[in-house]
Design a protein with these regions (language model features):
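Ligand-binding pockets and gating/stacking loops
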Residues: 1-255
Length: 255
């Protein structure tokens, strides 16, 4: 927020003076890439200070959008998540290429009070989290579609693990299950209404077409136009892939 008595013109003139000073300093060290990168990052931060406040102001969204996302109903946690979903769409409209949203990320000490980590009280906790997430998430996808943005936007809904099919401890919660859980993809390049893979009858382990996180990442990278076998990063003396050596694109989910 701009301080009282400090106008937009003052802000612009200050930025112009700073840019000239930085440019003069950079001319003295023409080969200093770190200095150039730091100046560029400050300039980007300055541009964000000018454009971000307007973009984050959701009061100019029509009532129909607020109703669609549910910013005015339910718990405060749901309202905030719904606002973040609208903000995600606005960021995409401005050309931001990657937007990440979190749901149920509040710490709980393992009791699942404000997140999905329900080692106890799973019935009430998951009901609360589902109420927070369902309407805004569905509204975001529908909104992207109605604006013609879903054709070139990939929506990835993912988690790190699921829950065991049996109760634990005091009988009201369930432990982590890394062997069977659900993620979904929507939008650009993905089949509509298609499911891939199944678990056993208990929901304990993936049984048909098990998918690793490397396969999942390879598929996402493919949909983003990146070859996961050629995209490498130097780490500990080796060129490493994000998909390790055994990740494969899941062809069956591609449109």
């Amino acid at each position: 927020k701009r301080p009282a008595g400090y106008s937009a013109t003052d802000d612009r003139l200050t930025a112009e003076v700073l840019k000239r000073l930085n440019g003069n300093h950079l001319e003295k060290f023409p080969g200093d890439a770190d200095l150039a990168a730091r100046i560029a990052s400050y300039e980007l931060a300055g541009k964000m200070q000018i454009t971000v406040p307007e973009m984050m102001d959701l009061t100019n969204e029509p009532d129909s959008i607020h109703k669609q996302y549910g910013t005015d109903t339910g718990s405060d946690l749901k309202k905030e998540y719904a606002k973040n979903c609208i903000l995600a769409r606005r960021l995409l409209e401005k050309g931001v290429r990657v937007v990440q949203l979190f749901n149920g990320s509040d710490p709980s000490g393992g009791n699942g009070i404000t997140n999905w980590d329900s080692h106890s009280n799973i019935k009430n906790t998951h009901a609360m989290q589902a109420e927070i997430m369902d309407q805004p998430t569905a509204a975001l996808i529908a909104d992207l579609k109605q604006r013609g943005m879903l054709d070139d936007t990939l929506v990835v809904w993912a988690t790190e693990f699921g829950r065991m099919p049996f109760l634990q401890g005091n009988g009201t919660g369930r432990d982590h299950n890394p062997d069977a859980f659900t993620c979904f993809l929507a939008g650009a390049g993905v089949k509509k209404g298609h499911s891939y893979g199944t678990s056993d009858n208990f929901g304990a382990k993936a049984e048909k077409d098990p998918t690793s996180v490397y396969d999942f990442n390879a598929t996402i990278l493919h949909l983003m136009g990146l070859d996961h076998e050629r995209l490498t990063y130097y780490h500990n003396g080796l060129e490493r892939r994000l998909t390790n050596v055994h990740g494969h694109v899941i062809q069956d989910v591609l449109a």
